[in-house]
Design a protein with these regions (language model features):
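Short histidine-centered beta-strand/loop micro-motifs
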Residues: 26-29, 37-38, 46-52, 68-70, ...
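A short, N-terminal "cap"/entry segment at the start of jelly-roll beta-barrel domains
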Residues: 1-34, 47, 113-116
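Short, charged/polar surface micro-motifs in flexible loops or helix N-caps
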Residues: 31-33, 41-44, 64, 102-104
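Short, conserved beta-strand element in jelly-roll/cupin
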Residues: 39-40, 50-66, 99
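Ligand-binding loop in jelly-roll beta-barrel domains
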Residues: 71, 82-112
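Histidine-centered metal-chelating micro-motifs
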Residues: 45-47, 66, 78-87, 105
């Protein structure tokens, strides 16, 4: 009889908070989806970007973020569909859990910011 185990991992051992998906290192290597937990300080400048294929399911665990004029706060869920350009404004220190499907390496397209 084999007994189960629990393994412990440090999120800092994974690239950018992404710990499940079709990349290394990964706790579960799969092309089906990706999972991350990220913490963003208030005012952090994040890449303005979009995904051609993937859909992101996001849950705000702490803080507040504004995307496209809508403020998402602790407890809010929001879905970002393919080809929607995201330019987040972190209004407070913010922690977000993201599930992205499918897991497609290279499916992030950065959009240049134009200054007036």
């Amino acid at each position: 009889m084999t007994k189960g185990t629990i393994t412990s991992h440090d999120i800092s051992d994974f690239k950018g908070g992404w710990f499940i998906g079709d990349f290394n290192p990964s706790l579960l290597k799969t092309k089906d989806f990706e999972v991350s937990v990220k913490t963003h300080p208030k005012g952090e400048i994040w890449d303005k970007h979009y995904h051609k294929i993937a859909t992101e399911y996001n849950y705000v665990m702490e803080g507040a973020v504004e995307i496209d004029g809508v403020i998402y706060k602790k407890g809010d869920l929001f879905v970002i569909h393919p080809e929607f350009v995201v330019d987040p404004n972190f209004l407070e220190d913010c922690s977000i859990m993201c599930v992205k499907t499918p897991s497609v390496v290279g499916d992030k397209y950065v959009v240049k910011r134009w200054r007036s």
